[in-house]
Amino acid sequence: MKITILTVGKLKEKYWKQAIAEYEKRLSAYSKIEIIEVPDEKAPENMSDKEVEQVKEKEGQRLLAKVKQQSTVITLEIKGNMLTSEGLAKEIESRMTRGQSDFTFIIGGSNGLHKDVLDRSDYALSFSKMTFPHQMMRVILIEQVYRAFKIMRGEAYHK
């Protein structure tokens, strides 16, 4: 079992790094875990729609270059499927019983994900209709993946 979290941009704040490190340690009991950061595209503040698409395309190319062909890709999208923690556990477990053992979760940059990345996605996941900083989403995602494994194993977890 392998979980990859593929994300645009680097974590800078120590507190986010510490939270990620804690959940990486916990999750390692259930799965190999890798976090891959691709550089975000430098862009001016007030971009035209065309410039936004160009930024998303460049970031998307960087993301797709890191996705293994056999990996099940789960993109985080505002318009994705909203699940409970138990629902996420069932989704992962269902895919595992069908022989899928390599999962890549993709978190886009501040402008979202390019169409090419969305087209490569096997499942669109949403945690909320709200927008969150991608640094925070990394922590929320890794915690929920950890929680999903606890649920799948029938182990106690904090509700």
From Swiss-Prot:
Cellular localization per UniProt: Cytoplasm
Q: Name one GO molecular function term.
A: rRNA (pseudouridine-N3-)-methyltransferase activity
**Which Pfam families would you find in this protein's record?**
SPOUT_MTase
Give me the residues that bind S-adenosyl-L-methionine, please.
Answer: L76, G108, F127, S128, K129, M130, T131, F132
Where does this protein chiefly localize?
cytoplasm
Keywords attached to this Swiss-Prot or TrEMBL record, sorted alphabetically, are: Cytoplasm, Methyltransferase, rRNA processing, S-adenosyl-L-methionine, Transferase
CC per GO annotation: cytoplasm
**InterPro entries given in the database record:** Alpha/beta_knot_MTases, RlmH-like, tRNA_m1G_MTases_N
Q: What is its EC number?
A: 2.1.1.177
Question: What broad class of enzyme is this?
Answer: transferase
Where, by residue number, does the polypeptide cross the bilayer? none
Q: Describe the reaction catalysed, as an equation.
A: pseudouridine(1915) in 23S rRNA + S-adenosyl-L-methionine = N(3)-methylpseudouridine(1915) in 23S rRNA + S-adenosyl-L-homocysteine + H(+)
UniProt KW ATP-binding keyword = no
Task of the protein: Specifically methylates the pseudouridine at position 1915 (m3Psi1915) in 23S rRNA.
The record's comment on protein family reads: Belongs to the RNA methyltransferase RlmH family.
Q: Tell me how this protein assembles.
A: Homodimer.
Official protein name in the record: Ribosomal RNA large subunit methyltransferase H
According to its UniProt entry, this protein's organism is: Staphylococcus saprophyticus subsp. saprophyticus (strain ATCC 15305 / DSM 20229 / NCIMB 8711 / NCTC 7292 / S-41)
